[in-house]
Amino acid sequence: MYWYRDGNLLSLLPWLAAMAAVWLGGWLLATHAFRLQARERLIVGLALGLVLYTWLANLLGHWLSPDLTFTLPALLLLLVGGLLAWRRKEGPWLDRGDLKIWPWLLAGLGLIYVFLLWSKGLTLFDEHKNLSLISIMGNGDIPPHFLPNYPLNFIYHYGFHFIGASLMRLGGLLPWSAFDASKALLWGLMLLLAGLLGRRYVGRAWGGWATAAVVALAAGTRYLLLLLPPGFLLQADKVVQLQGTSALIGKPFSQALSSPWPVDGGPPLPYMFGFLNGIMDPMVMAHQGPNIFAVLILLLVWFLIPRLSGRWSFLLLAAIFSTWALAWETTYALFLMGMVAFSAITYWRRGNTDLPQFKPVLAAAALSLPIALVQGGTLTELARDFVFGIQGPGLLQSAGAWISILTPARVLKGTFDVLGFSLRWPPAILSAHLGALSLFSPVQLIVGLFELGPIILFTPYITRWAWRRAQAGDWLLGVLASSAWLGLLVPVFFQYQSDRDISRLSWQALLIWTILLVFVVADRSFGWRAWLRHSAKAALGLMVFGGLVIAGTQFSAAATTRLGDGYNELDAAIAAKLWGRLPEEAKVFGPMRSTTVLTGHLSGQLLDKPGPSDVWHTLMAAPMLDLLISERYDFAYIDSRVWEDLSLEVRNAAGLDAVCVQTLAEVWDNSHVNFRRMLDLRSCP
């Protein structure tokens, strides 16, 4: 049971109907609110519809039932699109010529299928967190809580998870199939947008496919370190320390480059560490999900801003920006910072910011800020904690941190943190796998440059090209170039309380520069010498090669199916009986990881285990009925893998066979040895 809770393919029909309405509504909006070309409207309409569907579902989910939360946004999109088409009163509502893009749609289906095959065979990257979010959001916990009945919601960018949650609620899917299908859908659509964007800038079909290939495959070039003299790599062993999961390789850096990466849930043919990257992994490896959605929104914004048409496009753009904040606040903030930086530079050089459509876009971005602070997600919860002090003293202490900005930098260092940021000294290139690589250490600097990839050598030319195009009217390129520079430099000079998290800023910078380099290479009017143009092509080829190796590695997982990390057919069977059927106010005991995922009901702390003093640990070691009742649990979930690990004395003394205990649901394997069981304790005094 990988796909459906009831095993019936027809269960998907309500979701397909909702998505048809989303696509049709998005197509209408793309046609009548923006000045798009015929070959762009259908695909951009699907992306626009999905992004706005996510935003509406998040807003409605605060108050409405799960069924309405995931159904009503589709109808609203269709209604708004129809009203906008009716108000225009000129030309057809939709142009049948838009359907000539059908070969691209077939290519998109192929891309979705390939990524789905990879995802079905892999259980990588925050699997528990993603499955839990999809499950509880599909069951109506919006915004998702961190603990049951706890005032602080989960601090996370959960926008991506609405697509998977809709597949569970409307499509009858299980958590793992909903997760994999939502990733695959957005990944394929993301590459179609990249292809259309490349087609627009290059003016030829090959430009579209080249841009899509770069977005999918481009990565850092750590593997090129293997070409350096052995003596250099031995020097690197002394100053480069592996971080996180990479440290489990247990070898010096020089040997780790040609070693498998020991990650749980990886493909049968393991990833080679030398082809991975701690700054820019290829998008073929984007199995966590939110980064796919963030790139899709970036490309959508890139598409729509030059094609605004009236107040409706302004309002829709504000909603898209707000969804971006919900999908990945880091890249959203980086784009806004790029707008501010570009505005300042333009005003300084020209004395004004009179550029086509610049002020409406700036207003849409400004409108999205207060929405982002109240709609839910990371920014909302950080703002709530800052003001109300749910996890600390609140505004008073936080305000003190802001005052510290006015003090000299040498006093700041090691004394104050501002919103989790502090100065980094010495400056360094930050890699999630290799840590901070100091700019003042020649060996670390060289390793860091290879980690970034050869794109870094072409940034002056990319910036010059983008700025010239910006001054000629395509100012969005100037904003993107500015945000890319900020994304590179902020992690170099500032560190964060969770330092590896801000490596995402550098990832965004490298992605933007790589896309722009494709456009620069294709622009024959740009004054490059021939050897520079050929060198840029070679640099793109070297960055794409690493992604090709990763993609080839993942094909070894295409023939396998994994339900989820640690889940099997019994878990799927009990989920079919339990998901969405427990009372909303019920308190449920069980292994926090599986109980939440399989029932859609938050059974405890969403991420990680509770502190050692929590009674949950006592109950897991000895689930005594009297203690469960005294802790006001209504249900107890029993997994035979956990139950059999208890001593016979504990099992006999637990009292879970009392008359008052009823079995709500139970499944066994064919050997009648392994089981999953949900016990109803509500009748016990």
Language model: regions and residue ranges:
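Membrane-interface helix-loop-helix junctions at transmembrane boundaries of multi-pass membrane enzymes
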Residues: 91-100, 306-313, 348-361, 457-484, ...
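Extracytoplasmic
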Residues: 470, 523-685
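Hydrophobic/aromatic-rich transmembrane helices and adjacent perimembrane loops
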Residues: 184-188, 289, 333-339, 497-528
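Active-site lumenal/periplasmic loops and adjacent helix-entry segments of GT-C-fold
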Residues: 109-297, 561-565
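Start-transfer (signal-anchor) and selected internal transmembrane alpha helices
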Residues: 64-116, 205-212, 359-363, 539, ...
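Membrane-helix boundary/interfacial segments in multi-pass membrane proteins
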Residues: 13, 62-67, 122-127, 151, ...
